[in-house]
Amino acid sequence: MLSRADTMIRNAAPADHAALLALWQANAPRQGYASRPDAEVDRLLFRHPYFSYEYTFVRAEQGRAVAFICGCVGNDIPHGRERGCFTCLAADPAWDTPETTVQLLDALEEAFRVAGKTTSAVTFFNPMHLPWGIPGSPGHEHNNMPGIATDLPLHERMLAHGYTETTQETAMYRTLTDYAIPPEVRALEHRTAAEGCTLALYDPNRHHGLDAMLQALDNPDWTARVTAAARDGLCLPVALAGNTVAGFAGPVYPEPTGRGWFAGIGIAPQYQHRHLGKLLFFRLCAEEKRAGAVYMSLFTGVANPARRIYESAGFTSVRTFGVLLKTL
């Protein structure tokens, strides 16, 4: 705990809840976070199962909270045995300074060390998802940040504080109002079908090999989400070799915000390089629109070749985020 005559860095406590909520509501939108009613901010942040005052710190000036930082830990979080997760930092404009950032980061990082963590991380593995507004859109939003937005002073401050940017993720977006699968993609689908691979919506009574395909992809998050979608009967576009599942995109799930959600696109190794990823993504967008989604947004690595697929479907980059790690 840091303390000077009128300045104190300390753990937050339940008695600080109203002050923390007020700080968030007044200042988080400046970072691009979506505006939410108090009760919704509580659900997303201060009452979230992973929220803990043990990993929340306040800068107080003459007894008044002027900034706070929040993180979380959990051995069930991917890499959680060695990593603590940075969640957010909000500050009054007069106190939104490099000094405040360093003081709060120091406090959070020390708490991670005490908990036995060796790394402080800002990644999409953080289970506390805070929605943000998509620039230039009519109020559309994405449901979480995978890092620190590169347009924020916080990004440079964290790099200066010893964080390493391991990669950058770009947020891509398009509305679905005028979306339609173009003729050239339809033609590609016909050529691919002639070569033995077709597209369909997953039907457990007709299609097999979903589990084997997921096992080959070796992505635990995809396995959990796609298996649950198939079990629950959600719309799941798949690529087929005969009746064997060769790949997936989805599942199709319009969120209450109007966003078409999906876990990802995966093609089994033996069926790659046949344009199936592109065909599935175009089909996914059509199914999301049919199900009532009005827009889609997603993240991809700035150097990920899949970015070309998204761009060919009319998606544009709207914001870039740095994935940050620091060895403690």
Show where each model-derived region lies.
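Conserved hydrophobic beta-strand within the GNAT/NAT acetyltransferase core sheet
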Residues: 120-123, 262, 296-300
